[in-house]
């Protein structure tokens, strides 16, 4: 499946690819041969060093504050940026907990060259997700998320809901829990699947 995706990317003359989860070395040679720029998402210094050794063109540095798939070590964005910047001059895109110019300026001061926002755009006017999801973000607080599945991996950060309360108490999550993601995003059923969002919900007060 991944090989097919790679072939399509090359055939369609895509110029920029972001990879994540694991070692990019297995993909990067083919992508670079096709003159494609590759940024790899990393949640740790060790992951960044591995990606640098593999020959990536840049890094998306993801702090624990962000929503979605996370590293169980829970290292914050600014510690990560500064730690990684000491080892490379490659472009760094900061991700996790950024919703506005203040967060962007802080990321730049720490050593980033760009930013990536997820939760903020989920709760934007242009976002196609259901109003229930947007409302849960706007009405949430910085303490309104869990990191789930820390004992087993992969971990995810998601909003506190009836569903995630149960998953958190049990300690383990089957990835099939994400199968209802369309019903969550577009049907508005907040318990159809874990609602992936970051701690930045505490900074978002309106759509």
Where are the regions a protein language model picked out?
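Conserved acidic functional residues
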Residues: 41, 96-97
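Active-site entrance/lid segments in N-terminal catalytic domains of soluble metabolic enzymes
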Residues: 2-87, 91
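Conserved active-site-proximal phosphate/metal-binding subdomains
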Residues: 71-93, 99-207
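Acidic, glycine-rich active-site loops and adjacent beta-strand->loop/helix elements
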Residues: 65, 97-98
């Amino acid at each position: 499946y991944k090989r097919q995706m790679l072939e399509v990317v090359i055939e369609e003359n895509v110029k920029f690819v972001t990879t994540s989860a694991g070692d990019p070395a297995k993909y990067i040679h083919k992508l670079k041969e096709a003159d494609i720029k590759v940024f790899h998402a990393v949640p740790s210094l060790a992951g960044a060093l591995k990606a640098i050794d593999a020959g990536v063109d840049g890094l998306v540095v993801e702090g624990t504050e962000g929503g979605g798939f996370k590293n169980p070590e829970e290292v914050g964005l600014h510690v990560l940026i500064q730690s990684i910047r000491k080892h490379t001059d490659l472009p760094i895109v900061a991700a996790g907990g950024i919703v506005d110019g203040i967060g962007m300026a802080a990321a730049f001061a720490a050593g980033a060259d760009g930013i990536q926002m997820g939760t903020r755009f989920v709760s934007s006017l242009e976002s196609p997700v259901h109003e229930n999801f947007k409302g849960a973000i706007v009405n949430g607080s910085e303490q309104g998320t869990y990191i789930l599945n820390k004992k087993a991996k992969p971990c995810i950060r998601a909003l506190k809901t009836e569903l995630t309360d149960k998953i958190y108490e049990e300690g383990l999550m089957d990835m099939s829990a994400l199968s209802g993601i369309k019903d969550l995003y577009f049907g508005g059923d907040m318990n159809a699947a874990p609602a992936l969002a970051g701690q930045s919900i505490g900074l978002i007060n309106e759509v």
